[in-house]
């Protein structure tokens, strides 16, 4: 673990990290999030009987779109040329929840952790949005980075 924040300069002000001199490397990040709900709500999603349509397809597209827009949402995040974004949704009826996983890849000078986290988060938020008419007390939880590869800090895996 590093002992310094990279987005704070010597004067204590927030700044975007200068990556000009960094090497271009293959980078990859995986993240996950969960959304817990009543068994009946999950069944509506799984059976396709939700009145708003295919919840998983909409959440998947929202997550992909969110990864591409991460630098518009996170102020000091660099805009990146993503080469792959994947969002998968898995119903887990035994736990009354959906597990969302994301994968982001690129060849670049900075990592894609924020893009992967944003993809998983927004997919979960989209499920909430589409299902809130049926259930308002759903819980989004355990959003975390699962793995990152590439760059100076090397490989990280939970």
Curated annotation (Swiss-Prot):
Recorded superkingdom: Bacteria
SUPFAM superfamilies in the record: Molybdenum cofactor biosynthesis protein C, MoaC (SSF55040)
Organism for this UniProt entry: Shewanella loihica (strain ATCC BAA-1088 / PV-4)
Family as reported in the entry's similarity comment: Belongs to the MoaC family.
Pathway: Cofactor biosynthesis; molybdopterin biosynthesis
GO biological process: Mo-molybdopterin cofactor biosynthetic process
Keyword Lyase attributed: yes
A molecular function (GO) term: GTP 3',8'-cyclase activity
Chain positions recorded as substrate binding sites: 76-78, 114-115
A Pfam family reported for this protein in Swiss-Prot or TrEMBL: MoaC
Gene name as annotated: moaC
Record's catalysed reaction(s): (8S)-3',8-cyclo-7,8-dihydroguanosine 5'-triphosphate = cyclic pyranopterin phosphate + diphosphate
The protein's name in its UniProt record: Cyclic pyranopterin monophosphate synthase
Keyword NAD: no
PANTHER family in alphabetical order: MOLYBDENUM COFACTOR BIOSYNTHESIS PROTEIN 1, MOLYBDOPTERIN COFACTOR SYNTHESIS PROTEIN A
Catalytic class of the enzyme: lyase
CDD domains (alphabetical): MoaC_PE
Functional description taken from the UniProt entry: Catalyzes the conversion of (8S)-3',8-cyclo-7,8-dihydroguanosine 5'-triphosphate to cyclic pyranopterin monophosphate (cPMP).
Quaternary structure and partners: Homohexamer; trimer of dimers.
UniProt keyword annotations, A-Z: Lyase, Molybdenum cofactor biosynthesis
EC number: 4.6.1.17
Active site per the UniProt annotation: 129
């Amino acid at each position: 673990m590093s002992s310094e924040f990279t987005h704070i300069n010597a004067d204590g002000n927030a700044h975007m990290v200068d990556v000009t001199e960094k090497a271009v490397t293959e980078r990859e990040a995986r993240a996950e999030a969960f959304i817990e709900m009543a068994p009946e709500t999950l069944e509506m999603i799984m059976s396709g009987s939700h009145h708003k349509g295919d919840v998983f397809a909409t959440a998947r597209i929202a997550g992909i779109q969110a990864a591409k827009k991460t630098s518009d949402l996170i102020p000091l995040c660099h805009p990146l040329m993503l080469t792959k974004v994947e969002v998968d949704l898995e119903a887990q009826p035994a736990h009354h929840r959906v597990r969302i996983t994301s994968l982001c890849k690129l060849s670049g000078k900075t990592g894609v952790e924020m893009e992967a986290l944003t993809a998983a988060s927004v997919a979960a938020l989209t499920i909430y949005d589409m299902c809130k008419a049926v259930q308002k007390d759903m819980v989004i939880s355990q959003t975390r980075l699962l793995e990152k590869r590439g760059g100076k800090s090397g490989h990280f895996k939970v």
